[in-house]
Amino acid sequence: LLDVLVNVRMTVIKLEGGGLWVHNPVAPTGELMSMLAPLVDEHGPVKHIVVGSAAIEHKIYSGPFSKKFPSADVWLPPKNWSFPVDVPLEQYVPYYPLGSPKTLPEDTASGVGAVPWQGEIEHSVLQVGGSSLRGFKDPWFVDTAFFHKKSKTMLVTDVVLHVSEDPPPVSAIDPEPLLVRGMERPDAMLPNTREARSMGWGKTVLFGLLFQPAAVDVKIDLANVNKSFLDGFTWDPSWRDGFANLCAKPLFVPPILQVLAFPRRRDEVKAWA
């Protein structure tokens, strides 16, 4: 709607007994499959496809990805409904070679629950809040922290972030979303330069984490709503300071979660952390 570019990432870990463990799979394009092929040749097949978040953008490709690796188990976090409307994942992605996905136990670090990889990778699931649409039964924010013991690497999806000053290199393939978002005022389209893409990246980050940054004035023309959502924005130069402040933090909790999610369950969040 806002032409905001949001990249998601996938992580692959080789298991000590052979095979691969995949975290938050992305679309199994030809390019991705060609990148995975050498890993499969060297370390063995994909054994586990693991999604740590309830957000649809992170689990939507678990079905298509598992179709490429039909012998792999698919794992999703518990109480895995999608905010704000609960639609079973099988209706979004009607193909899982081994049937319905398996459910991650809530915590392996404390010895509760068992998964095949727990000797190498520990995990703990965070479930926060409850939606009135579900009678406050199920959490609307779910994330999972995984800890790979050998490399001492932590994997999370949304709960902790680091923002780089430069946009991800993949965004240069189709720079239009960044160029549109980088405009300082309506109809002031930018040339495709590194500086312009960086401006678009900074504003994209602010939109993605804040929704309504203080440095932007939005004017919606009801006679031309679609165009307004693309370029009806006038930015104050102070956006640069806001973006720089985010980049200066080694790690931080997204402001949206700080305001909307975590205050509801402070004790649970502290215990999980």
What do these predicted regions represent?
Residues 1-17:
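Zn-dependent metallo-beta-lactamase
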Residues 107-155, 159-166:
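Core dinuclear metal-dependent hydrolase active-site scaffold
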Residues 13, 27-32, 120:
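Active-site-proximal segments of catalytic enzyme domains
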Residues 39-116:
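Active-site HxH/HxHxD metal-binding segment of metal-dependent hydrolases
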Residues 27, 37-48, 56, 60-68, ...:
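Cap/insert and terminal regions of metallo-dependent hydrolase folds
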Residues 10-12, 22, 143-147:
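Conserved hydrophobic/aromatic beta-strand scaffold that supports enzyme active sites
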Residues 13, 53, 146, 158, ...:
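Divalent metal-coordination and catalytic microenvironments
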Residues 23-26, 50-54, 76-78, 126, ...:
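Short His-Asn-centered micro-motif
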